[in-house]
């Protein structure tokens, strides 16, 4: 596509957003997302419908050129990734670019709840998620660094882009992904161990862990207590 084509697509998306604008919902978001500017006020169901249309056409090209101008622009990017069809490695590569944009609970939770690749490829997506545990034995790249005995500050850790995120939303992303897709017989013990070791985040990370533990208790009360 030419750049003018992307501009046309972005104009169409922006037009759709304003057609679905709900001022009262915008006020609700503004109250519950402190510090988040440029909110249009579009409900999640409407954003999902826009994202599905994009995902069905050319999700990769859209994400390469998608703007970050408003809250809804960023939410749509996460939803498009959730609905994307294609090679898993490509989807995860784009997800690695997207996850550092998470800076509030609405972007985080809407993305996590629609990322169906986690249901289809749990083992691979688990490893992907664990990169965002940072300097933790749950992080496969961190384990490799420790096993190789690389001195601190040398060699680097191939952990994607988690260093660019606040601990709060990096860990909330992990917690909500675990809550949505991994509270099951195969992963419950790993989930509970991960929740126990997510103490570095702030309010939103702890809130995500609380959601994860609540889901764990509902499904596996004896293990969770």
Go through each PLM region and give its residues.
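Alpha-helical scaffold domains
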Residues: 1-225
